[in-house]
Amino acid sequence: MIRTFMHAKLHKATVTEANLHYVGSITIDEDLMDAVGIMENEHVHITNNHNGARIETYVIKGERGSGVICLNGAAARHFQVGDVVIIMAYGQMTAEEAKTHRPKVAVLNEQNEVDQLLYEEIAHTIL
């Protein structure tokens, strides 16, 4: 059986832009994408730590080193500049593959730079 597991997470990202009139998606600094293995057009879930909103969309590459986290289209109604968010991507694998799988988790600072890179989701950790 194939199951779905988290493979990448950008934790504590800060929204830098919200563009209502853009055609959907989220724009992410390509350096951040590379840090955790998220690819262009990949399906992601985004949660807003400020208001509890949770959406699904796809990724557009943003300028390297810019720190950009921009919610585009209708998502801009639920995310505002300065909101802290979590961006998660999932992969499908067998139960056997999942036994050795370790997701990449980048904990970001307020400038959307990688502060910590983890290879597991630690239970009961407050970051």
UniProtKB/Swiss-Prot annotation:
Pathway: Cofactor biosynthesis; (R)-pantothenate biosynthesis; beta-alanine from L-aspartate: step 1/1. Catalyzes the pyruvoyl-dependent decarboxylation of aspartate to produce beta-alanine. Belongs to the PanD family. The active site is at residues 25, 58. This is Aspartate 1-decarboxylase. It comes from the Bacteria. InterPro entries: Asp_de-COase-like_dom_sf (IPR009010), Asp_decarbox (IPR003190). It comes from Exiguobacterium sp. (strain ATCC BAA-1283 / AT1b). It catalyses: L-aspartate + H(+) = beta-alanine + CO2.
